């Protein structure tokens, strides 16, 4: 059975291939995948830390920030997205992260990546993922096909 998050991965990767053909990216297909105990143990040995984001876009870009009423742009070394299926609630009404060990671990990794010069975010659903990607990479750069 295909999970909602797996479909989201496929759709986002398809969008990137079609709309940003020169941009390099990698998605972690093993994320959420059912593995045998042996496969899971082997996979764990190759990882430094749990909760690594689902998608990495290897393209520098700019993100907008606001401070003291001023708007500026920061250059980032690449973008990491942790993709969540549509409807997943990450935050409480007061804006704090919901109590969930796995999501808290993911948020910690995203924070560390942001501190290291990357743009790292949660993206809930296809529309939010595409908006974050477009804000970071700019408008799609379709290749012209000449005959």
Feature-to-residue mapping (PLM):
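Catalytic phosphate/metal-binding cores of nucleic-acid and nucleotide-processing enzymes, i.e., regions
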Residues: 1-147
